Structures are given as C-alpha cells and as structure tokens.
Swiss-Prot record:
One of its GO terms (molecular function) is dITP diphosphatase activity. Binds 1 Mg(2+) ion per subunit. It comes from the Bacteria. The active site is at D70. This is dITP/XTP pyrophosphatase. Pfam families: Ham1p_like. PANTHER family: INOSINE TRIPHOSPHATE PYROPHOSPHATASE (PTHR11067:SF9), INOSINE TRIPHOSPHATE PYROPHOSPHATASE/HAM1 PROTEIN (PTHR11067). Keywords: Hydrolase, Magnesium, Metal-binding, Nucleotide metabolism, Nucleotide-binding. Its cofactor is Mg(2+). Substrate binds at S7, T8, N9, P10, G11, K12, S71, F180, G181, Y182, D183, K211, H216, R217. It comes from Anaeromyxobacter dehalogenans (strain 2CP-C). Mg(2+) binds at D70. The keyword tRNA processing does not apply.
Length: 235
C-alpha cells in the first residue's frame, strides 16, 4: 500500500521510511508522484490543527492515505517561541510580548523548497536563537521539540493524530553535522542525564538510530505505527 508523506523535507522522509521498514507500506513523497503539493495555509491554532488540515487536504488531492506533520521547537525563555513558526522564524518580525507563538499560527508554513535554501534558512534560524538566548545560563535554556502527525484516508476522513515530545536544552554553540533544523543546538534531556562532567551531545551528533529513539518525531511515528499496521492489514 502506498502512503503519502506530505513533505519534501528529506530528513523527515528518511525518519519515516526507517520507522515503517517492517510494514508492507511504501512511503511516497510528492516528488515520487511527480506533482507539487498543493499549498495549505497553516492557520490553525495549534500544531494538531495544522497537521490535521494538511493530512485531509493532501489525502483528497492524492487519492492515497496521507500523513502530515506539524512540528517545532518551543523555548521556555522565549515564551514558547518559535513554536509553530519554527521553520521560518528568521523571516518573521520580532514577536510582541503578548504573542504566545507556540500556540498561534498566523502565517503559512509552506514547504521550504530546494535543500540548499532550507539549509540556509536553518542557519539563520539558529543564529536568531543563539542571539535571543545570549548570556542566559543553562538552567534558563530549557526547550522542547513537539511533533504532531495526522493520518487521513483517501476520501479525506481523518483516521487520527498522535503527538511526540522531546524535552531538552539549547546549547551555546552549534555542534554536529547530522539532522536538520535546530538539531545542532538542541541537547536532548537523555543526554543531560549523563551526569556532571560528561560530554553531552546535540541532536545533530546522534546516530540515526539514537535520534529515532529520542526524537519527538520518532515518538510520534512509533505511536502512529498501530494505525499504519491496521491500514496495511486492510482493517
């Protein structure tokens, strides 16, 4: 059975394909279909609302079961920013003091185009995050990754949604060449538990298997597996 994952982000596609490798499913991307995804304006109030809206729209468009992801980084010291604006945070004007960015989606988070353009935006986003937290000690650099996955049938019926969270802390400098987004700055809580004096690794320094075990998206994908297994069985 073909399953559309509504993303052109190669990192997200690799994660999902690794995690469903044992199921009789073929994860396809918009590139595999030879058609660009239709734009869905992400104007929902939460990650969940945006993920559900995309999954329903893309399932109807493709005629396939579809999975959509909405995810982001929420930093405690920034009142939850960048939150739903994580992908394009560096392109936005500074948020006002009353803007709970982790819950409000006032702009469309469109897919980010070529890999080179996405990497450049990641760099700008990380620069902005480092500047925003400049001078803050480790105890005030708490953060979490959040991911919501929504699954819809070809007729647009919503099957369900799942959520994954990865708590951690923002480092003081980039480390690691793996991952994408804020991974070079994000130190997962499991690494912090190593104890005083231990060298902790960022998400970008973990192997693929280690990241799958710890990440917000890995947790969400694992929660989604029973739904996907039922679909593969024809349930």
């Amino acid at each position: 059975m073909d399953l559309l994952f509504g993303s052109t982000n190669p990192g997200k596609l690799r994660e999902l394909r690794r995690l469903v490798a044992g199921l009789p499913l073929r994860v396809v991307s918009p590139d595999d279909l030879g058609r660009p995804l239709p734009v869905v304006v992400e104007d929902g109030a939460t990650f969940q609302a945006n993920a559900e809206k995309k999954a329903v729209a893309w399932a109807r468009w493709s005629g396939l079961h579809a999975v959509a992801d909405d995810s982001g980084l929420c930093v405690d010291a920034l009142g939850g920013a960048p939150g739903v604006h994580s992908a394009r945070w560096s392109d936005l004007e500074p948020e006002g003091p009353a803007s709970p960015v982790c819950e409000l989606a006032g702009v469309a988070e469109l897919e980010l185009g070529p890999v080179a353009g996405r990497a450049a935006r990641d760099e700008r986003n990380n620069d902005k995050l480092l500047a925003a937290l400049s001078g803050l000690p480790d105890p005030r650099r708490g953060a979490r990754y959040e991911a919501v996955l929504a699954l819809a049938r070809p007729d647009g019926t919503l099957v369900g949604t799942v959520t994954g969270t990865c708590p951690g802390r923002i480092g003081h400098a980039r480390r690691g060449d793996g991952g994408f987004g804020y991974d070079p700055l994000f130190v997962p809580a499991a690494e912090l538990a190593a104890g005083e004096g231990a060298r902790v690794r960022t998400m970008a320094e973990l192997s693929s298997d280690e990241k799958d075990a710890l990440s917000h998206r890995g947790e969400a994908f694992r929660k989604l597996l029973p739904m996907l297994a039922a679909l593969a069985r024809g349930a």
